[in-house]
Amino acid sequence: MLSLHGLVRGHDLELGRDADTGGQVTYVVELARALGRSPAVERVDLLTRLVEDPRVSSDYARPVEELGPRARILRVPFGPRRYVRKEHLWGHLDHLVDRCLSLLGESVGLPHVLHSHYADAGYVGTQLSRILGIPLVHTGHSLGRVKRQRLLDAGRREAAIERQFNFRRRIAAEEETLEQASLVVASTVEEIERQWGSYENLRPRRALVIPPGIDTSRFSPPAGSNAPEGAEWIDRFLREPGKPMILALCRPAPKKNLARLVEAYATDAELRERANLVLVAGNRDDLRTSEPEERRVHSELLYLIDKYDLYGKVAFPKQHRPEDVAGLYRLATGRRGLFVNPALNEPFGLTLIEAAASGLPVVATRDGGPRDIVANCRNGLLFDPLDPKAIAAALKDALSDGRRWRQWSRNGIKGVREHYGWPAHVERYSKAVRRVLHRERKRLRRHVTSVRGATLPARLIEAGHVLVTDIDDTLLGDRESLHELLEWLRLRAPDVAFGIATGRTLPMALAILGEWGVPRPDLLVTSVGTEIHYGPSRMRDLAWTRHIRPLWRRASLADALSGLPGMTPQPAMKQGEFKLSYDIDPARLWPLERLQGHLRARGLHARLIRSQDRFLDVLPVRASKGLAIRHLAYRLGLPLERFLVAGDSGNDVEMLLGDTLGVVVGNHKPELKVLEGLDRVYFARASFAGGILEGIRHYGFASPVAAEVTP
């Protein structure tokens, strides 16, 4: 398992110490222990960051820590030695990938499964999975796209939150992880449908809800008439400590929405009269030396307490110990109080389960995991976290009926036992992983690669067939047949993905497609196969870019070709990072063999593609339309027989050869006559899109009959 940020150890978890040490740390430590106790699991290694910093315990500098039977923490150094927040780790993750490869290859041994937690570990897990061919399981915990939107909704400026949280990189990593993961474990249905559902690469069939468990030996109702635990360090803040206690326990993070909770309490006289408010939001010493985010949260809470003169009604202790938490829940239960979680978004809500196991009813945000928890446990109410009046109303309602409060208390204890125990979690998890190993292990090992690929949209991944066509004089040229082809594609979605392969640059390709009313393709192979982009967002395939880059010396090639007869560079808008394009005079141009010799003599390597007796493109040796399509087939795991490709000119030759289903449209250039007679190249009589449709009918492409006979 990979969980990289925060302070991770097997005892005395410092939950709430900072924004990175929260529920995820509890989750991964307890999951590792629970899996280690299972006879179905040989060993569990929880890999995290080794931290050497006098400000934190030396426990976090120990390379190995045993957690229990067959489970341990492995700490790997990467990035700064000191403890830093997770947003500062992104630039060091590639180093961790290399160190993990060394660690797994030399001393630890290869695991059967990788399980990454959060986006940073997802990035590392994705690279390891690609390189080693090991299936990847991923748990998101908190999703960048969801958090970003919530902060915007709360009034934060986009530029400011991008600087603070680096959302672009985080979201890109999450998309990439979704592409690679064999299984996504979520805590709630809402997490899959509304949160992961906002990502392009979610494959719902690979997402599974397995609610986390809790250690029920730690969290239980108060026993009989014993004195309440922790009363003294809370009661010193309160004038009437015997009143019902509204407990909020969380990290000091803006998304936890504590300021709005205090506003709701402060502005409702009835609620203030009925109950006390207890805020346990991490630990603080000198605010001047706190982390900026924590300082802002703590300062705002102190300001609001003072602004509304809540002294004697609100307890806001500076410090608490991990062992105090269970006693806090029992104290609130003993005083017929409530646990409140006002977070803007709560991916799961582990503290809600801890409270429920302690017999404490809950009132929580309606956004995220609390919906499932309250539905399963039937022990409280939900509210709109953006509406202070709704928060206050829900709290008053929950306190208004003693009989219902007692029923909620009993329901919560029972519900946790039925739905949130670790043994049940491990059983479901183990079954899911066994299915992944059976289904995907061989396929993943065939796809071992050392490059870090670009994200593929789910639309492409889920397609069983792909139609790829040139643009000029192939797809475009006749509006009537184009309309018929587009309708054919619409009716066959999502089984058939649509792509273009063109000599045009990406902007030029999008412009001409827009002029003809063609919807944006799922795949765009542009600049004669030197660039690949995917989906509506036009994500670039960086793996392809890295693959074609070796031996490409663009400036040197341009210098070597400068001034040669019969070659005139095309305008800058038609050039590309990996493409030099020329208009040619066939009568004066050197033969291609002579041009290649000219370049090789200068230590230069390039692919030369001549088309229509008018153009010459100079490309990296690893690039072409045909190679780009084969790269895609490799990434998708689709046989080339599932690709129908159509073209009309010389730069289409490579993609028309081989096992693809080739279609040459009726208005093709004479240079394609060399392909006549080949088994899988069909020469259509119809022109433009009509020729593509004719080829589709010829092959029975994407028809039920074709699906039965095509391997």
Where are these regions (language model features)?
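Active-site phosphate-binding/coordination module
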Residues: 481-572, 667
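Non-catalytic pre-domain segments flanking phosphatase-related domains
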Residues: 414, 418, 422-469, 487, ...
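Conserved acidic, metal-coordinating active-site core of Asp-based
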Residues: 555-644, 649-658
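Asp-based phosphoryl-transfer active-site loop
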Residues: 461-480, 656
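A short, Lys/Arg-enriched amphipathic alpha-helix followed by its capping loop at the start of a domain
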Residues: 31-41, 268-271, 465-467, 484-496
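Short beta-strand scaffold positions
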Residues: 116, 138, 186-187, 364, ...
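Catalytic cores of nucleotide-sugar-dependent glycosyltransferases that transfer UDP/GDP/TDP-activated
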Residues: 1-353, 357-441
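Mg2+-dependent phosphoryl-transfer enzymes with acidic/Ser/Thr/Gly-rich catalytic loops
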Residues: 619, 626-711
